[in-house]
């Protein structure tokens, strides 16, 4: 799901749907941006596998705009995931 494909959910909604991240990189208020797989972002929520260090999912934000939820594949590439409906 991307912000362009439908109305962008807010941070509280995404938090409720995917839960608290294991780690966070950057901040939506951070002026510096990063680029991953062609997406510019300044905050990344990181979700690691339970009991491990392997990253299984990330949520990307650019400022307060939701960019999407992505499954991190074994080769390091991203696969878009739909936002869970809880």
Locate predicted features:
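Residues within mature, well-folded domains
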Residues: 1-86
């Amino acid at each position: 799901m991307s912000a362009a494909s439908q109305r962008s959910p807010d941070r509280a909604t995404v938090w409720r749907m995917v839960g608290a991240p294991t780690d966070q990189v950057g901040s939506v208020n951070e002026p510096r941006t990063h680029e991953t797989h062609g997406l510019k972002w300044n905050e990344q929520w990181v979700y690691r596998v339970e009991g491990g260090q392997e990253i299984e999912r990330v949520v990307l934000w650019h400022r307060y705009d939701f960019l999407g939820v992505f499954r991190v594949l074994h080769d390091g590439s991203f696969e878009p995931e739909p936002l869970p409906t809880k």
